[in-house]
A protein has these predicted regions:
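Alpha-helix initiation and N-capping motif
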Residues: 52-53, 78-81, 98, 144, ...
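Non-catalytic accessory segments flanking P-loop/AAA+ NTPase cores
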Residues: 50-54, 61, 68, 89-93, ...
Length: 177
């Protein structure tokens, strides 16, 4: 953690360090799934679907005269991100909600339909993401709906269904919640 190795040489990563990744559907030729250990390192997995027509029109026309990415402006500094992370950690999580998160995680581990349940890293991700959502909602505490709202995004990519079971990872986690 907090480092990367290239050709046997290890390099420390800056703080904060974030990765945003995209993934093509598995049906695409040349697309391979990541190993469980790598998937587990992503805080959330969000499916965005296709944009609506008006947004896609704006997207297309923004490419008329060059690359729009060249004109992006920073909205936060590294220090801003670190401060927001610190603030999010101060958001209160009642013991009953900690128990609720643990119950969800343990249900994935003891589910006959799942080959792999959620790791401790996944539990921490749901906990931290719930704190962040509460902060964005301008609350000083997490509520059950925060956990419910984020459970699929924080956990579904961390579970693996047994080969003979029907349903997606998303459906499996939704069934547990």
């Amino acid at each position: 953690d907090r480092q990367v190795s290239v050709d046997g040489t290890t390099y420390p990563l800056p703080t904060p360090f974030m990765v945003i990744a995209t993934q093509n559907p598995f049906e695409f030729e040349g697309t391979y799934s990541l190993p469980e250990s790598q998937l587990d390192r992503f805080l959330l997995r969000i499916s965005m679907g296709y944009p609506d027509e008006s947004f896609e029109r704006e997207l297309l026309t923004s490419h008329r005269e060059g690359e729009p990415v060249e004109h992006l402006q920073a909205v936060l500094t590294s220090d801003d991100v670190l401060q927001l992370q610190k603030q999010a950690r101060q958001i209160r999580v009642d013991d009953t909600l900690t128990d609720y998160i643990l119950a969800i995680v343990n249900a994935t581990r003891n589910n006959d339909a799942l080959h792999v349940g959620v790791s401790s890293r996944g539990a921490i991700s749901l906990y931290r993401a719930s704190q962040s959502l509460a902060m964005l909602e301008k609350r000083e505490y997490v509520i059950p709906d925060d956990v419910k709202q984020l459970a699929v995004s924080a956990l579904a990519h961390r579970v693996m269904a047994k080969g003979f079971m029907q349903g997606t990872q998303r459906e499996m986690v939704e069934g547990i919640i």
